[in-house]
């Protein structure tokens, strides 16, 4: 009887772990958002109505804003392909033409409708205010021609 009880407990444990693993995998698959470049999207690597992230560079001269609204349009490129993006929310402060961007959304009729925009920058980014503070002003000396005299109290 004791061996039968252990076998039953082991089977229940295996069933519980299997169920938990299946539910976890299903939840993760539903929440995964893949990153694609414009050339991959136009090649058809994504399904038409699925959510995904679009990464690339905002093409210079492509940014347009509808006056009086938050609606914007711009083109994201990876150097090989171009894809039009529409966005209807406030853009991040770092958003600029010629800079990297990651947009989350879905394709609709050949246009990427973004729900979220992340402006990316490289590791050498320095805020403008910090750059201005780091530049020497006319009253600052960039080097000393003479040694500093020591003062004694």
Curated annotation (Swiss-Prot):
Biased composition (Polar residues): 130-141
Pfam family, one: CcmE
Protein name, UniProt field: Cytochrome c-type biogenesis protein CcmE
Entry's Gene Ontology molecular function annotations: heme binding; metal ion binding
Subcellular location field: Cell inner membrane
Function field: Heme chaperone required for the biogenesis of c-type cytochromes. Transiently binds heme delivered by CcmC and transfers the heme to apo-cytochromes in a process facilitated by CcmF and CcmH.
Homology family: Belongs to the CcmE/CycJ family.
Membrane topology: Single-pass type II membrane protein
Native organism: Xylella fastidiosa (strain 9a5c)
Protein's UniProt keywords contain Transmembrane helix: yes
GO biological process, one term: cytochrome complex assembly
PANTHER family: CYTOCHROME C-TYPE BIOGENESIS PROTEIN CCME HOMOLOG, MITOCHONDRIAL (PTHR34128:SF2)
Transmembrane residue ranges: 7-27
Periplasmic face residues: 28-153
Region entry Disordered, spans: 130-153
């Amino acid at each position: 009887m004791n061996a039968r009880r252990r076998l039953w407990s082991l089977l229940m444990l295996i069933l519980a772990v299997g169920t938990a693993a299946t539910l976890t995998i299903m939840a993760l698959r539903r929440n995964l958002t893949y990153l694609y470049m414009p050339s991959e999207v136009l090649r058809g690597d994504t399904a038409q109505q699925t959510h995904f992230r679009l990464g690339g560079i905002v093409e210079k001269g492509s940014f347009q804003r509808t006056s009086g609204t938050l609606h914007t349009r711009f083109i994201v490129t990876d150097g090989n392909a171009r894809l039009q993006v529409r966005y209807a929310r406030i853009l991040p402060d770092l958003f600029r033409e010629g800079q990297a961007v990651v947009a989350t959304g879905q394709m609709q009729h050949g246009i990427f409708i973004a729900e979220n925009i992340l402006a990316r920058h490289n590791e050498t980014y320095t805020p403008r205010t910090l750059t201005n503070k780091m530049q020497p002003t006319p009253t600052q000396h960039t080097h000393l021609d003479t040694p500093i005299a020591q003062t004694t109290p």
